[in-house]
């Protein structure tokens, strides 16, 4: 391929990603997995009173992929065949027991297939080396599958079983299945199928995101099979995966979908690190905005797709990509979440550290704006990686990719980048000089080994893999520039690269992608493979000619002997321009990031005297420089300038209106006071201050910055008081906090307008957080509040008694909604990634039920609001609902509600009737049960690593029925 062809191919790959990145369901290119497909095939549903296998196409996929020996595919590792065969055997057995609508296969044929599958699995288990297995979660998945098969009457004995159970015990020693009930994202959510019989699936529903559990079809299938209520959203998710994932309607599903972040940042980081100019590529801005928004929304730590739980790999590579795209972001949240004493962890409870994850964290630090700030962490990662190489005698085995060349490639890139920073004084040398020397020696050994490993046809890998060959070529292109490389080895490297590129350029019937990537089973991805191949071909094309004098290295790229860096590899200028975006040179060397590329145009061109906040762009005082479509200041918040006019800005024309008949006056403080009169009156009356205390208590865990916390406290106070103004009007209340309600003083219309006005003032306060997610949270919460209030008014005005469940749903929207708004805003501003909303909703329900009880029984309430105000308002509160539904044939209480009585005698009669139905005793029992559940949740959070929270316990204790 010519350089232009390579650039066009890279742009086409970016376009492929960008066209789908805004799909609300996400995208993914992971290959179909027999294992997950088998689990989805086992979902049944009752339709028109008939049990039906819901996804018959998945079962057909399983049948069509059974091998002659009775087993299923071993993509690249023996664990693939074990998991694929175990899950498929389980599916076959269950379809044999319950054929339902499946008529495409006879019982005899199915029985024969089961026998062959059983024999194949026994053979696989007998030959399995358990200790050599690295795949994610195998230690809990295989034992679980063996138990499920035993339940179906199929048992297996094999020599490695005892060792397998030891590893399972070790894995689960720090984990209890009940952790899944907590509002904390744990990796076990990706494998709920391993916990059938060990958990109540109804209690994990709060972890569902867009119809899936940690984007896993098999985990989602297990939930659908064992939850007591059918979930249409999960069904819709799986139908979408079957139709739109890599199986393309064949019935096959991947081990994860979507994987939008992972399969965006891996190709982009691969292309950007080798110098592809993607800033002008179609759709790059969509991807950059998507990634930056995800980074902000998830507070600096991300997973393979939004809101599935963060990992160091995806976090580091997203940060790397954003920095290379001139959207600088901080690494601080990543370090806080994943840094350990001697290495960086991928997830919170991983059994063994990942080599590649530590490489990616290291690369993110090395490409950060100021790598010198993270010298200690850089050295920590280097020490860990170097030790992994030396201890294993270069036999490094990673848990996410099966190819040794993948780990070597990442290490080579890291060493090259580290050396470049040290040579340019951007980073100090390592304190341990022996490691510094060892790294260069290591790179020399890696290069020598890679050259020797090349196959006669120019490929690398056991299967003549194009993707592995790309890894190897990339390694050699970095090693080529090493000063320590002898001329003889440099020549051999050049020949190996040329032969490798010839192999990569061959058009064959074989797919370029390879089964190298590790999930529950091994998978391949066409976009990952294409990115590595394009990267290898570009790095190779950028090598100097054989006859050129060896050149110094700038940012890992030879200047090919030219003294000035405006010529790279003999080519004058970049992109055919002398001045790009107002800078005088276009050598592609970014003074902030020092990207290893030859044709980037977004840097400071190495001018240290240019302020960092402009990234080298200099604007004239009275004229706007032409930007050629690139972004000023290097951020996606700036709008491209075309012909001197911002595409995103309107053109304002000054017109003199001094003689106009009407000129709008400024809004005055006196006018503001008129609108806020009812609000200020109610604010002046002392209340319980419960919400402010709740915020402070949760901040023990969330540790929100003071400036943000002050805004949130103000917003919640404003919104609470404004909603009370409206509530008092709609409930026709007389007293509020022992004083006349605001609308009895200011009038109904003025009080209502004041309440609505403050809703918008509160929204303006939320905007001060400068967090797009906070705006969405606020708007969604207002919608919930009005939904809750609307249903309560409907029941009252239509005299329809809701069920207890309907009432609690209303409370979750109304009272709980305001509680949740406070904590959701705090979570949006915090760095800790724990979902406290289930606990907050529980506290909101407890608070409201207690309030309902005290409204009818407390003398303090009588003083503040009148005796049994809920009866006077005709309101269906929790004890009233129970009493009415305890004896539906007795209409006395509902008729009293209809009258909205003000007479104390009638109210006392209603209370005595409610005593006769044991409604107050029932309410006390419900509160006790809910408070126990809340305490258990709080203790679970604390046991899971959060500090003891006395404040929340005090708030819970205050939610009392004591009169």
Swiss-Prot record:
Region of interest (Substrate binding), residue spans: 227-292
Motif (NSE/DTE): 333-341
InterPro entries with a match to the protein in the record: Isoprenoid_synthase_dom_sf, Polyprenyl_synt, Polyprenyl_synt_CS, Terpenoid_cyclase/PrenylTrfase
Native species: Talaromyces verruculosus (Penicillium verruculosum)
GO biological process assignments: alcohol biosynthetic process; isoprenoid biosynthetic process; mycotoxin biosynthetic process
Residues at which Mg(2+) 4 binds: 727, 731
Gene, per the UniProt record: PvCPS
This protein's name: Copalyl diphosphate synthase
Annotated binding of Mg(2+) 3, by residue: 727, 731
Sequence segments annotated as region (Disordered): 627-657
């Amino acid at each position: 391929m010519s350089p232009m062809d390579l650039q066009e191919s890279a742009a086409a790959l970016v376009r492929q990603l960008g066209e789908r990145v805004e799909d609300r369901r996400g995208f993914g290119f992971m290959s179909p997995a027999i294992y997950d497909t088998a689990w989805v095939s086992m979902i049944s549903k009752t339709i028109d009173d008939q049990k039906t296998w819901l996804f018959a196409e998945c079962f057909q996929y399983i049948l069509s992929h059974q091998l002659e020996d009775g087993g299923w595919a071993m993509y690249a590792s023996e664990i693939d065949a074990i998991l694929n065969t175990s899950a498929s055997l389980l599916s076959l057995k269950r379809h044999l027991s319950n054929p339902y609508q499946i008529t495409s296969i006879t019982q005899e044929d199915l029985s024969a297939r089961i026998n062959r599958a059983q024999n194949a699995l026994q053979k696989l288990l007998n030959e399995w080396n358990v200790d050599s297995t690295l795949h994610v979660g195998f230690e809990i998945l295989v034992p679980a599958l063996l138990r499920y098969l035993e339940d179906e009457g199929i048992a297996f004995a094999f020599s490695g079983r005892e060792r397998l159970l030891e590893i399972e015990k070790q894995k689960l020693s720090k984990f209890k299945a009940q952790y899944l009930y907590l509002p904390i994202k744990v990796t076990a959510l990706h494998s709920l199928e391993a916990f059938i019989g060990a958990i109540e699936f109804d209690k994990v529903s709060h972890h569902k995101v867009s119809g899936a559990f940690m984007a896993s079809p098999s985990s989602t299938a297990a939930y659908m099979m064992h939850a007591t209520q059918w979930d249409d959203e999960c069904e819709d998710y799986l139908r979408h995966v079957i139709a739109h994932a890599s199986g393309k309607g064949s019935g096959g599903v991947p081990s994860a979908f979507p994987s939008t972040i992972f399969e965006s940042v891996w190709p982009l980081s691969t292309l950007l690190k080798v110098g592809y100019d993607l800033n002008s590529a179609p759709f790059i801005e969509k991807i950059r905005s998507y990634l930056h928004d995800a980074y902000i929304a998830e507070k600096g730590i991300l997973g393979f797709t939004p809101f599935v739980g963060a990992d160091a790999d995806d976090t580091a590579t997203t940060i790397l990509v954003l920095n290379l795209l001139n959207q600088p972001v901080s690494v601080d949240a990543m370090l806080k979440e994943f840094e350990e004493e001697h290495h960086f962890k991928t997830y919170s409870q991983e059994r063994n550290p990942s080599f590649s994850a530590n490489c990616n964290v290291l690369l993110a630090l090395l490409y950060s704006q100021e790598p010198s700030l993270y010298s200690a962490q850089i050295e920590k990662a280097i020490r860990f990686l170097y030790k992994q190489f030396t201890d294993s005698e270069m036999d490094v085995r990673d848990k996410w990719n099966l190819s040794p060349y993948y780990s070597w490639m990442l290490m080579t890139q890291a060493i090259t980048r580290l050396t470049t920073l040290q040579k340019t004084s951007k980073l100090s040398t390592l304190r341990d000089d022996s490691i510094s020397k060892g790294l260069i020696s290591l790179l020399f050994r890696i290069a020598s080994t890679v050259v020797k490993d090349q196959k006669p046809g120019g490929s690398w890998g056991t299967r003549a893999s194009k993707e592995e060959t790309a890894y190897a070529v990339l390694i050699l292109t970095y090693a080529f520039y090493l000063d320590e490389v002898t001329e003889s080895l440099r020549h051999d490297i050049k020949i190996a690269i040329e032969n490798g590129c010839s192999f990569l350029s061959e058009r064959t019937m074989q797919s370029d992608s390879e089964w190298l990537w590790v999930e529950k089973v091994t998978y391949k991805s066409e976009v990952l493979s294409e990115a590595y191949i394009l990267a290898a071909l570009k790095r190779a094309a950028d090598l100097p000619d054989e006859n050129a004098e060896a050149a110094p290295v700038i940012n890992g790229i030879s200047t090919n002997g030219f003294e000035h860096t405006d010529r790279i590899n003999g080519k004058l200028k970049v992109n055919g321009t002398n001045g790009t975006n107002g800078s005088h040179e276009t050598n592609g060397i970014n003074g902030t990031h020092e990207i290893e590329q030859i044709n980037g145009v977004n840097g400071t061109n190495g001018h240290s005297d240019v302020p960092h906040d402009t990234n080298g762009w200099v604007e004239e005082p009275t004229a706007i420089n032409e930007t050629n479509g690139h972004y000023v200041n290097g951020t996606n918040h700036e709008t491209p300038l075309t012909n001197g006019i911002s595409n995103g800005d309107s053109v304002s024309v000054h017109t003199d209106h001094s003689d106009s008949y009407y000129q709008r006056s400024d809004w005055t403080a006196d006018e503001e006071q008129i609108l806020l009169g009812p609000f200020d009156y109610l604010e002046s009356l002392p209340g319980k201050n419960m919400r402010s205390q709740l915020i402070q208590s949760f901040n023990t865990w969330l540790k929100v910055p003071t400036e943000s916390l002050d805004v949130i406290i103000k917003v919640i106070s404003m919104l609470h008081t404004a909603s009370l103004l409206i509530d008092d009007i709609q409930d026709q209340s007389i007293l509020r906090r022992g004083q006349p309600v605001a609308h009895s003083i200011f009038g109904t219309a003025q009080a209502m307008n004041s309440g609505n006005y403050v809703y918008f003032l509160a929204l303006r306060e939320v905007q001060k957080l400068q967090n797009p997610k906070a705006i969405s949270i606020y708007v969604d919460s207002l919608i919930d509040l009005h939904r809750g209030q609307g249903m309560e008014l409907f029941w009252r005005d239509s005299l329809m008694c809701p069920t207890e469940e309907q009432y609690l749903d209303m409370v979750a929207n109304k009272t709980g909604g305001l509680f949740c708004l406070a904590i959701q805003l705090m979570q949006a501003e915090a760095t800790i990634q724990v979902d406290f909303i289930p606990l907050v909703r529980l506290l909101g329900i407890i608070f409201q039920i207690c309030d309902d009880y005290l409204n009818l029984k407390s003398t303090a309430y009588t003083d503040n609001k009148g005796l049994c105000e809920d009866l006077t308002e005709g309101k269906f509160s929790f004890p009233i609902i129970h009493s009415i539904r305890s004896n539906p044939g007795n209409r006395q209480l509902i008729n009293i509600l209809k009258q909205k009585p003000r007479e104390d005698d009638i109210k006392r009669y209603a209370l005595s009737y409610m005593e006769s139905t044991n409604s107050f005793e029932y309410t006390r029992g419900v509160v006790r049960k809910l408070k126990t559940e809340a305490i258990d949740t709080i203790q679970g959070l604390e046991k899971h690593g959060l500090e003891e929270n006395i404040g929340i316990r005090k708030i819970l204790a205050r939610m009392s029925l004591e009169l």
